[in-house]
Amino acid sequence: GAVMAHELNKKGKKCLVIDRREHIAGNIYCEDVEGIHVHKYGAHIFHTSNKNVWEYMNQFAEFNNYINSPIAIYKDELYNLPFNMNTFSKMWGIRTPQEAKDIIAKQVAETKITEPANLEEQALSLAGKDVYEKLVKGYTEKQWGRDCRDLPAFIIKRLPFRFSYDNNYFNYQLGALEYRSVRFET
């Protein structure tokens, strides 16, 4: 909405942007608190593989180089996310993608789940018991406040799962953490 309104306004059109929230700009909205620009919904991680989009956005904001590479903790052990070869190497002491695929395939086959009915079954049928127990179950139940067996299966399909040693959460060529924010004016 904001981009469309901006572009139409540049062409002399008047625009009315309506948002269901009490403000415009969606999740990149910032509040001015005593002269400090506060990101209401958290830091803005911008990522794209489209160079034109990257150049367009750089007209409005300053970005710091940033790679999102989260870490999960399970029983005092650190695991890289998204699930990748660093994760599997730490978990199973292996080195190659084929070794990881073989372990996952064996664990998935052991579940005998053909039509997952909930998130737990979906995760087990995709990643096997070890990944589910160590890296999915606790986090998911904390995030949603519900048992994984009470959550729909589709939720787990959006987790990145890779067989490389790349710890970058996003598969985009261009990514950054917003340094100086876009200002939206009404």
Q: What do these predicted regions represent?
A:
Residues G1-A2:
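N-terminal Rossmann-fold NAD(P) dinucleotide-binding loop
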Residues N9-E34:
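Glycine-rich FAD pyrophosphate-binding loop
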Residues I18-R20, T48-S49, V182:
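Short His-Asn-centered micro-motif
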Residues E34-E110:
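Dinucleotide-binding Rossmann-like beta1-alpha1 core, especially the glycine-rich loop
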Residues E77-Y79, N86-T186:
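Active-site/ligand-binding neighborhood in enzyme catalytic cores
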